[in-house]
Amino acid sequence: LEKAYPGRGEELAKKAKELTLAVYKKCADYALERGIIIADTKLEFGLDEDGNVVLADEVLTPDSSRFWPVAGYEVGRSQPSYDKQFVRDWLKANPDSDYKLPDDVIAGTIEKYKDAYKLLTGEAFRDTGI
């Protein structure tokens, strides 16, 4: 950051870190109360036209985070998840797939995302058909 923003790199990195930890803590606490552990996530930041650090891109989705169910969580073992790990595991087990996912893997991934949605919102996901 120092190369990209001479004189501001350290300040911007500190601000991004503070924002990352604040967003993660608030969301992790919210999710934990609803039965989900947010194991990790990625957040992306940018600068607005006034040079302020702003949160950008997707935030805490199953594509950018690992969501584990609290029920059954055990330290030191692979965890079931409500995220794209399901797809990664299938691809790892099927290296000759040419990255074409079978319908059951796609459907399973959709169900995992819907399960996470329901736990986090308390409502069933309504498919709009879009």
Predicted features along the sequence, with ranges:
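Conserved metal-phosphate-binding beta-hairpin within the catalytic cores
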Residues: 38-59
